[in-house]
């Protein structure tokens, strides 16, 4: 433990000052989850040792690891036998992995919030010393329809329960592309008006700047709902953070990059977090992700602010 702490404290002195302190959007995959997602039974997955090595190569001290247990309940996939047992196993495996590097990694549990077991699993995670810090919800993977009042009410219940457990929430807000769910300003307002107020006392991190990676007019319309709320000092936004995970894509036009930079300034760089997503290929490794993010027309002071931001749930 002492050796790991010393390494973590020494890292900033041995790498560029521009390296982020924390990667706020990472995933580990158990061999079982990797086989499920890739369709390859021999898939080894991504473990904590691999991730920490990638963080070291990027000069990044820590990472927020978002469990992918929700993928066992993916709405567009055929049902899995003993689904809830797989969800628990994936959350537990993630907890075991991060426990190997307690000074470097922090885990959030996950599940499909529309499933009958959702509140039971949240309660179970709240009692786990490695998972009690927070919850990851993926509206796209779970096919949360923000135009469906029953879906909205159920997700609100999950938010209220997480607030009661004092668990932070990371939410992939973009609805299902596979199922062609509507998404834009109207759906973002539903989240702001009907779901977010269920968790007034805990931090909420909106992933991918309210998108799913990249940046287009649809994402911009949704994000605009939140930047407008920030501009009018809406109290519902006081604990909201945004990760800019895989926003900048190769070949992105200068005009798009400028739009993203403008939105980041409207959000406020003090609440924008760096994230690189699952390290499934060299192009998505933390170091490569930061290099892509650096293409944005932000000032060096703004990059330093984003790199140094430390959200409450990783302190």
Model-derived segments and spans:
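Divalent metal-dependent hydrolysis catalytic cores, especially in the metallo-beta-lactamase
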Residues: 38-39, 44, 49-77, 104-112, ...
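Short, acidic/polar
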Residues: 45-54, 116-126, 259
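Acidic-and-aromatic substrate-binding clefts and catalytic sites of carbohydrate-active enzymes
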Residues: 40-46, 71-73, 83-87, 112-119, ...
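Sec-dependent N-terminal signal peptides
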Residues: 4-13
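Active-site neighborhood of phospho(di)ester-bond hydrolases with catalytic His/Asp-centered motifs
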Residues: 21-24, 65-66, 108-109, 136, ...
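Active-site gating/metal-coordination segments in enzymes
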Residues: 77-183, 246
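Catalytic pocket-lining loop regions of alpha/beta-barrel enzymes
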Residues: 132-134, 147-273
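Mid-to-C-terminal alpha-helical segments outside catalytic/metal-binding sites
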Residues: 17-24, 28, 32-62, 266-273, ...
